[in-house]
From Swiss-Prot:
Subcellular location(s) of the protein: Cytoplasm
NCBIfam families from the UniProt entry: PRK13206.1, PRK13207.1, urease_alph
Official protein name in the record: Urease subunit alpha
Native source organism of the sequence: Ruegeria sp. (strain TM1040)
Urease domain residues: 132-570
Binding site for Ni(2+) 2: 220, 249, 275
């Protein structure tokens, strides 16, 4: 017969249930379980000696062909833009097969995920499950970035480059069909979904079209190549015709026009605006204004996330290196100083909290840290809770809405912007099983396990020579999904529809599956999730003060952050 047990005992056995609250690492962010799909109480499944998932109990006789899943993640606390709730998650063929209640339908009620003899179990009790992160601003300077990204909880990377060439050190472009081919062939080796952007800086369409046909699934306009109104207009025209996204780094020096001229050249066409605050580059001092445009999908790069007492100082040296500038040339120094403004960086914090900035990415090794996208997102959320208090949208004694808003910034929103939300970006049935499992005490900092296409690619692991997996040193190590031909079947390469239709995978002899992006055009900020605000932004030309709908946006820099030195003693 069922027996009543204390709520604390239940949470220790099966993880938190409806109404329980969980602190995210050492932040002030508190989430509350909204609902629990694993019940009824007393029918939960759990693996282990004397536990439920045994033959004839929680494990049915069902074959894989008969409907049993490949893997079940039991009793996980899902943290997603769609909600914060508890469920079992069934994986099959590398995708999310079902979300609900796992078990044996012959002996248990309400089973929606069949556990069979061919089913593996990942214990999600007391763990948080998120969708894998998507970093949409990558300079492919060195392949070692991928390891750092994966072990931080990222499962998809989009950007451009060919290695430490000077064009790549500054701009996110893989220019030309030949380079695109070499990079896609290299992508076969890595346990990471990869996607490549071509160079969009051209005033005539032929060379841009050539890159999209060669596999570029996005196009990058960068000021170092000349982001003129003519180039903007031409690039967006090709993008509209071929359904790829355009990312833009605008003209810091205002040589070919001001922000108003850039907006005019866009003609209301969808565009992903990189580092929209401006420290990473863009019309000085007021590029931040474009986050109020519906057709602009605004993102931040992570060095300005959040605003701290060290942000300004580190940016000047960072910028000189990244853009091949010379400290002995006064004009180069002036260029650098024009981009770093404490007023706009402070406003950026608040615009994220309002949902006016929609995406956070890294700008890897080119004024950004590839392994800190997730950390800095949650540091920003924590800083804003401390400084601004609860959001008006919150209900109950929790931060669920704020947490859902911020997780969307590195999962579903970049996926929508780049036409791959049908494949990744959230925990929903049918999407790829690119998932991250977290110990709540280490949430946002050090994943416990990362799955690529349903296969464990990395995990916290102890001494391989020990008699059990837990003895020190415990740290994140590559797992079976990161080796051999498993890599080819666990991760994918995203390409344009034109390249997919032409059989780019066969042409280049690619081992990984290629998937086409779609639906990147004609969308606006309103298509993004929980980050749709379009305030009217004004920037004072002399003081750089930022106002949104007339309200001054300012905040103090943080002197101390969570998710920092406490987690990185070694």
């Amino acid at each position: 017969m069922p027996a009543n047990i204390p709520r604390s005992d239940y949470a220790a056995m099966y993880g938190p249930t409806t109404g329980d609250r969980v602190r995210l690492a050492d932040t002030d962010l508190i989430i509350e379980v909204e609902r629990d799909l694993t019940g009824p109480y007393g029918e939960e499944v759990k693996f282990g000696g004397g536990k439920v998932i045994r033959d004839g109990m929680g494990q049915a006789q069902t074959t894989r062909a008969g409907g049993a899943v490949d893997t079940v993640i039991t009793n996980a606390l899902i943290l997603d833009w769609t909600g914060i709730y508890k469920a079992d998650v069934g994986l099959k063929d590398g995708r999310i097969h079902a979300i609900g209640k796992a078990g044996n339908p012959d002996t248990q009620p309400n089973v929606t995920i069949i556990v069979g003899p061919g089913t593996e179990v990942i214990a999600g009790e007391g763990r948080i499950l998120t969708a894998g992160g998507f970093d949409s601003h990558i300079h492919y300077i060195c392949p070692q970035q991928i390891e750092d990204a994966l072990h931080s909880g990222l499962t998809t990377m989009l950007g451009g480059g060919t290695g430490p060439a000077h064009g790549t050190l500054a701009t996110t472009c893989t220019p030309g069909a030949w380079h695109l081919g070499r990079m896609m062939q290299a992508a076969d080796a890595f346990p990471m979904n990869l996607a490549f952007a071509g160079k969009g800086n051209a005033s005539l369409p032929a060379a841009i079209e050539e890159q999209v046909n060669a596999g570029a699934c996005a196009l990058k306009l960068h000021e170092d190549w000349g982001t003129t109104p003519a180039a903007i207009d031409c690039c967006l025209g090709v993008a509209d015709a071929m359904d790829v996204q355009v990312m833009i780094h605008t003209d810091t020096l205002n040589e070919s026009g001001f922000v108003e001229h850039t907006v005019k050249a866009m003609k209301g066409r969808t565009i992903h605006a990189f580092h929209t605050e401006g420290a990473g580059g863009g019309h000085a001092p007021d590029i931040i204004k474009i986050c109020g445009e519906e057709f602009v999908l605004p993102s931040s790069t992570n060095p300005t996330r959040p605003f701290t007492v060290n942000t300004i100082e580190e940016h000047l040296d960072m910028l000189m290196v990244c853009h091949h500038l010379d400290k002995s040339i006064p004009e180069d120094v002036a260029f650098a100083e024009s981009r770093i403004r404490r007023e706009t960086i402070a406003a950026e914090d608040i615009l994220h909290d309002m949902g006016a900035f929609s995406i956070i990415a890294s700008d890897s090794q080119a004024m950004g840290r590839v392994g800190e996208v997730i950390i800095r997102t949650w540091q920003t959320a924590d800083k804003m809770k401390k400084q601004r208090g609860r959001l008006s949208e919150e209900t109950g004694e929790n931060d669920n809405f704020r947490v859902r808003r911020y997780v969307a910034k590195y999962t579903i929103n970049p996926a929508i912007a780049h036409g791959i939300a049908h494949e990744i970006g959230s925990i929903e049935v049918g999407k790829r099983a690119d998932l991250v499992l977290w110990n709540p005490a280490f949430f946002g900092v050090k994943p416990e396990m990362v799955l690529m296409g349903g296969t464990i690619a990395c995990a916290q692991m102890g001494d391989p020579n020990a008699s059990i997996p837990t003895p020190q040193p415990v740290y994140s190590r590559p797992m079976w999904g990161a080796y051999g031909r498993s890599v080819e079947h666990s991760a994918v390469t995203f390409v344009s529809e034109a390249a997919q239709a032409a059989g780019i995978g066969k042409t280049l002899g690619l081992a990984k599956q290629t998937l086409a992006v779609k639906g990147t055009r004609g969308i606006g900020k309103s298509a993004l999730k929980l980050n749709t605000a379009t305030p009217e932004i004004e920037v004072h030309p002399e003081t750089y003060e930022v106002r949104a709908n007339g309200e001054l946006l300012t905040c103090q820099p943080a002197e101390e952050l969570p998710l920092a030195q406490r987690y990185f003693l070694f």
